[in-house]
């Protein structure tokens, strides 16, 4: 009788399933969905239900499924520690609602760009780089547009202009008459 009960144990264990919606069950469900997507080439479209990933507009097989394209800022700054000028791409969502910390490529220092979650107490209520620099009397220049380009010459000296409306002499013909 004991042998009969023990021989049925694997069958009984396979039939036992958890009824909770805990993390393990969700993890298993996600793994099974990803496996099914890879095998069948299907993706879940929230608005339209199941659809083939190749029929999604503008998406190819190499495109990441379920990836949300977010708007970004292009941050260009000069490190005050080492003087390195660098550019970083930061999320607009993180800048306005989260925390943004960038690392200087020159000196490897970390610079706080935005702290909307009050992680850093030394900022005294300032939430982003615009407020931090405004408190110091410095300004932030915003450039908008897709192809925006801003060039600033730091040690600019105005060029010498000739008197009146005359054209400057041709430097290639010096001393010739």
Curated annotation (Swiss-Prot):
Q: Which GO terms describe its biological process?
A: chaperone-mediated protein complex assembly
Q: Zinc fingers (DNL-type): give the ranges.
A: 68-165
Tell me the keywords, alphabetical order. Answer: Chaperone, Metal-binding, Mitochondrion, Transit peptide, Zinc, Zinc-finger
PROSITE patterns in the record: ZF_DNL
Q: Where is the transit peptide?
A: 1-53
Highest taxon, organism lineage: Eukaryota
Q: Where does Zn(2+) bind?
A: 79, 82, 104, 107
Q: Where is this region: Disordered?
A: 155-177
Q: Which GO terms describe its cellular component?
A: cytosol; mitochondrion; nucleoplasm
Which InterPro entries does this one have? Mt_import_TIM15, Znf_DNL-typ
Q: Where in the cell is it found?
A: Mitochondrion
Q: Name one Pfam family in it.
A: zf-DNL
Residue intervals passing through the bilayer:
none
Would the keyword Chaperone turn up in this protein's UniProt record? yes
**Function comment:** May function as a co-chaperone towards HSPA9/mortalin which, by itself, is prone to self-aggregation.
| Subunit note | Oligomerizes in a concentration-dependent fashion. Interacts with HSPA9.
What's the protein here called? DNL-type zinc finger protein
């Amino acid at each position: 009788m004991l042998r009969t009960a023990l021989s049925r144990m694997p069958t009984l264990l396979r039939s036992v399933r958890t009824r909770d919606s805990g993390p393990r069950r969700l993890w298993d469900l996600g793994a099974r969905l990803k496996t099914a997507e890879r095998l069948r080439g299907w993706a879940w479209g929230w608005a339209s239900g199941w659809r083939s990933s190749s029929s999604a507009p503008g998406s190819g097989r190499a495109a990441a499924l379920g990836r949300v394209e977010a708007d970004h800022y292009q941050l260009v700054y000069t490190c005050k520690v080492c003087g390195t000028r660098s550019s970083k791409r930061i999320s607009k969502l993180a800048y306005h609602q989260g925390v943004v910390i960038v690392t200087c490529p020159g000196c490897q220092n970390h610079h706080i760009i935005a702290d909307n979650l009050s992680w850093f107490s030394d900022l005294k209520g300032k939430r982003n780089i615009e407020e931090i620099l405004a408190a110091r009397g410095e300004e932030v220049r915003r450039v908008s547009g897709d192809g925006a380009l801003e060039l600033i010459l730091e040690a600019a000296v105005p060029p010498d202009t000739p008197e009146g409306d005359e054209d400057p002499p041709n430097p290639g013909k010096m001393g010739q008459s």
